[in-house]
């Protein structure tokens, strides 16, 4: 939790600087490439982090680098939405991509379970001793990241550079001034800080809550993760359609209301069956919230 929190703070600081620099220089794809490479290396190097106290600091450092790079990847990745969509279908394309991402996450999780977690014998004669099953998952996920990033680098053109003569810092300050002058936009960015932190908390501690309060087994926690991803994928897909019809602001408001309602239900119930239903509802509203947040930024930022 602490690692995720620190990474979130650094993302809030580095994200605007990185975005301004890559936009001004016209190197969004190149920036994304280096971030993916860093994420790949940091995640794959977790293979060497054995369940032993002497590897604790090693695991913390590379886990932190992996998480931070993944967070920053989204900064460059989200900025490419305009290159693969038109103004009239931002919502549909964003929703479809979030849906695909969730399905990809589910697929990666299932493959890890089938290949490394459930079997008694692992591929390539890897031993389960010293956490070989979990460490193998780190290598697999790092390769998964590289493979499914390739279409971006092969088929999407580099966006045109911003022709402003201002340096990166002044360009960034100008962006902040635009935000502060627009009260509605300023309120949104403040709200975004809170609700995105809430989403990070949900993903980080959802499984812990299920384990401690409802006594979920490790297998049930995995099913819980799959359920959340399926419902979020469905919500993102449908939310993209409504985004183009109603606008991202309305979808965001509806999604936040749905998450709050589902969260309250989760806190009040004590039956497992109801927990599953409320969790599905929670995930269903998380998907469109993430998708429409990207669309809104795409529309309001030049």
Give a label for each model feature.
Residues 157-190:
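Juxtamembrane intracellular "pre-TM" segments in multi-pass secondary transporters
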Residues 94-116:
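Glycine-rich segments within core transmembrane alpha-helices of 12-TM secondary carriers
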Residues 1, 204-221:
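Short amphipathic helix-loop junctions that connect adjacent transmembrane helices
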Residues 30-45, 250-265:
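Structural signature of the two symmetry-related core transmembrane helices
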Residues 108-121, 142-161:
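C-terminal membrane-cytosol helix-exit motif in multi-pass small-molecule transporters
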Residues 13-27, 235-248:
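Helix-to-loop junctions at the C-terminal end of transmembrane segments
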Residues 47-62, 267-279:
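Helix-loop junctions at membrane interfaces in 12-TM secondary transporters
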Residues 71-85, 288-302:
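Intracellular juxtamembrane helix-capping segments at the cytosolic ends
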